[in-house]
Design a protein with these regions (language model features):
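Short beta-strand immediately N-terminal to the catalytic nucleophile in serine-hydrolase-like folds
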Residues: 155-157, 184, 245
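Conserved alpha/beta-hydrolase "acid-adjacent" motif
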Residues: 251-260
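Catalytic nucleophile-loop/oxyanion-hole region of alpha/beta-hydrolase
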Residues: 54-55, 90-99, 110-152
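N-terminal cap/lid segment of alpha/beta-hydrolase-fold proteins
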Residues: 29-73
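Hydrolase active-site cap/lid region
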Residues: 30-40, 167-220
């Protein structure tokens, strides 16, 4: 009996120690991985240009982060963050920590806003793609005014932003050459049957309504347009490398989404 009690005490002590150490680690790291990339920003690291305009009809802007001491006689490289939020929420400020981190490593970085579906405007993926492309044009013009030549870029994003980053990388419309793309938990194929949860969030009562919202078109056959806005369907032989990350569980993005993209890559 005494031996059993002693064993139980060891178990209790172990559990308490584990819980305390976990809480200490959480308090030290905060929201990982974002806490791990936090940068104490100052003029020695770079300069931030806030709320810069680019061509769009809805007043969207971008923020630009320029590292200190860049050599204007050499080619420079751009990383663009596109925020997530199920295409109906989020803002360019969501990318601040990432932009500061990559700027501290010597990359010109930017984070952009785009038209959201909750704003009650024409907010199709086609429009968002065009806005992202126009933002890149504005960034190129702005950095050239500053005396920098951006020779290549990598778009990145989370969830919805990852989709727009992939579309920018795969469709060949970026004025700055895209060398690779990286994203986390991004939709890759907008097959309506996969998106019942998003339809519920957006209060859509039919697959046709979903397709109309995503494409901005009121037509009967959406197959071609759904493919035209889906990264997995626009990957081709000229694809750039992609670094992708998906969780084992996701309350929003269906787990099969990564396989659509992987299968598309395996075709070429």
């Amino acid at each position: 009996m005494r031996k059993r009690t002693k064993k139980q005490m060891y178990v209790i002590v172990f559990v308490i120690t584990f819980v305390i150490s976990t809480l200490i680690r959480i308090s030290l790291l905060g929201s990982a991985p974002e806490r791990l990339i936090q940068v104490i920003w100052n003029d020695d690291i770079g300069k931030i240009y806030k709320n810069l305009d680019y061509e769009n009809a809805n007043g969207n802007q971008y923020d630009l982060y320029v590292p200190a001491g860049l050599d204007k006689s050499k080619n420079q490289y751009l990383i663009v963050f596109i925020h997530g939020g199920s295409f109906n929420s989020g803002s360019k400020e969501d990318g601040e920590a990432w932009c500061k981190y990559y700027a501290s490593k010597g990359y010109v970085t930017a984070s952009l806003d785009y038209t959201l579906q909750k704003q009650g405007k024409d907010a199709s993926i086609y429009l968002m793609n065009t806005e992202a492309e126009n933002a890149i044009k504005a960034i190129k013009e702005k950095t050239e005014e500053m005396g920098y030549h951006i020779s290549a870029m990598a778009p990145c994003g989370v969830s919805a932003g990852g989709t727009l980053a992939m579309n920018l990388a795969y469709n060949g419309n970026s004025i700055i050459p895209v060398k690779f793309v990286f994203q986390m938990s991004a939709p890759t194929y907008f097959k309506p049957s996969e998106w019942s949860l998003l339809m519920k969030v957006d209060k859509l009562d039919s697959e046709k309504a979903f397709c109309q919202m995503m494409t901005g078109k009121d037509i009967d056959n959406y197959n071609d347009d759904i493919k035209a806005i889906s990264p997995a369907c626009i990957v081709n032989k000229n694809r750039v490398p992609s670094l992708i990350g998906y969780g084992l569980k996701d309350h929003c993005v269906p787990l099969d989404q990564k396989y659509y993209l992987m299968d598309a890559y395996n075709m070429y």
